[in-house]
């Protein structure tokens, strides 16, 4: 008589309640945390800034309700696409994550989630986010706009390998470029019929640059939390480039972040945004740099959380700008 041997993880998956599966799918996409918020910030900012600009210059061709509807669509599309990217990252890194204290309990790394389940979930999310973009952008410039973030998402986990470091490539570069791309979606949500794709790129570039250097800054601090485990496995990250000068490196990046804000704000000519964005970010970034301690890697997590709060505040500031412009037009 032949007895069939069943893998413990496979047996666990077979007996697992549906509720546990759903929760693991939520966790693998980071929908239980604020990580995926990173993907929606640039798109929401871009939509609100473009909406405020159009309300000021062409008030008869748009409305506050239209701008807000585009914000919702852009947020959902970016957030869901980011969730798919998280699945891809965890699938590629599942063996590495199993050896790192902070990530060993992730659904794929721990074996609770089967790879086929993860891939099916990834496809569902990509299809949903693409459908939302088609709706928001009315079918124009969708595929060409999706190419950069799709390539960045696919490459990101591989940029953490030692081989990438040999070519001077760090994962934060790719993550920054990917996080900046939704700014094009946001601009297209408002000016899709008026602007060519090149016009959309040109108008979005200042915000894309800001998001790129901002992501490089806070993700360098965030990934520094894993410096001990990452060093053992030779994981590539921008803090490796900084070495013992990690604090000085973060100061330099903060300077670039703040220097790029005026370029973003110039077309709006808004005193409110200068105070609520430039002013608040200057104070916030200074506070982060004071509290970051290179000898305590956990303070990198504090920098990450502070930047999420700054980003949420900036959504509020941009929303107020839209309302101020609308009130002025009444």
Swiss-Prot record:
Pfam families from the xrefs?
UbiA
The UniProt entry lists membrane topology as:
Multi-pass membrane protein
Its GO CC terms? Answer: plasma membrane
The EC number of this protein is 2.5.1.-
TM helices/strands, residue ranges = 35-55, 71-91, 116-136, 142-159, 166-186, 200-220, 248-268, 270-290, 308-328
Q: Which InterPro entries match?
A: Prenyltransferase, UbiA_prenyltransferase, UbiA_prenylTrfase_CS, UbiA_sf
Which processes are annotated in GO (biological process)? Answer: terpenoid biosynthetic process
List the Gene3D superfamilies. UbiA prenyltransferase
Null allele phenotype: Abolishes the production of 15-deoxyoxalicine B.
Give the UniProt subcellular location, in the record's own words: Membrane
Q: Which cofactor does it need?
A: Mg(2+)
Q: Which domain of life is it from?
A: Eukaryota
Do you know which CDD domains this protein is assigned to? PT_UbiA_COQ2
Annotated function: Polyprenyl transferase; part of the gene cluster that mediates the biosynthesis of 15-deoxyoxalicine B. The first step of the pathway is the synthesis of nicotinyl-CoA from nicotinic acid by the nicotinic acid-CoA ligase olcI. Nicotinyl-CoA is then a substrate of polyketide synthase olcA to produce 4-hydroxy-6-(3-pyridinyl)-2H-pyran-2-one (HPPO) which is further prenylated by the polyprenyl transferase olcH to yield geranylgeranyl-HPPO. Geranylgeranyl pyrophosphate is provided by the cluster-specific geranylgeranyl pyrophosphate synthase olcC.
Q: What else is known?
A: The 15-deoxyoxalicine B cluster is a rare cluster that contains its own geranylgeranyl pyrophosphate synthase (olcC), in contrast to other related clusters which rely on a FPP/GGPP synthase localized outside of the cluster.
Q: What is this protein called?
A: Polyprenyl transferase olcH
Query: Species name for this entry?
Result: Penicillium canescens
The taxonomy runs: Eukaryota, Fungi, Dikarya, Ascomycota, Pezizomycotina
- Its gene is olcH
């Amino acid at each position: 008589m032949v007895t069939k041997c069943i893998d413990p993880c496979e047996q666990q998956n077979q007996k697992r309640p549906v509720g546990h599966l759903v929760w693991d799918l939520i966790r693998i996409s980071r929908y239980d945390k604020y990580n995926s918020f990173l993907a929606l910030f640039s798109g929401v900012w871009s939509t609100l800034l473009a909406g405020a600009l159009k309300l000021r210059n062409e008030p008869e061709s748009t409305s506050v309700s239209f701008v807000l509807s585009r914000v919702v669509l852009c947020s959902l599309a970016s957030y869901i696409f980011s969730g798919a990217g998280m699945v891809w990252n965890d699938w590629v890194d599942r063996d590495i994550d199993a050896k790192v204290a902070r990530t060993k309990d992730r659904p794929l790394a721990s074996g609770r989630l089967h790879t086929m389940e993860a891939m099916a979930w990834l496809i569902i999310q990509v299809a949903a986010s693409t459908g939302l973009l088609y709706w928001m952008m009315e079918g124009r410039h969708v595929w060409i706009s999706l190419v950069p973030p799709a390539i960045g998402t696919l490459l990101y986990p591989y940029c953490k390998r030692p081989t990438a470091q040999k070519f001077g490539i760090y994962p934060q570069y790719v993550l920054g470029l990917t996080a900046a791309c939704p700014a094009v979606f946001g601009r297209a949500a408002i000016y899709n019929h008026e602007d060519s794709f090149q016009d959309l790129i040109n108008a979005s570039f200042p915000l894309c640059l800001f998001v790129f250097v901002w992501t490089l800054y806070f993700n360098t601090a965030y990934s520094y939390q894993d410096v001990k485990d990452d060093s053992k496995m030779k994981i590539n990250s921008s803090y490796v480039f900084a070495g013992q000068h990690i604090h000085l490196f973060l100061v330099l990046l903060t300077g670039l972040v703040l220097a790029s804000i005026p370029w973003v704000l110039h077309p709006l000519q808004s005193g409110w945004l200068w105070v609520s964005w430039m002013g608040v970010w200057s104070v916030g970034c200074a506070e982060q740099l004071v509290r970051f301690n290179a000898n305590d890697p956990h303070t990198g997590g504090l920098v990450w959380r502070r930047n999420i709060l700054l980003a949420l505040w900036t959504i509020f500031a941009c929303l107020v700008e839209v309302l101020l412009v609308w009130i002025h037009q009444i």
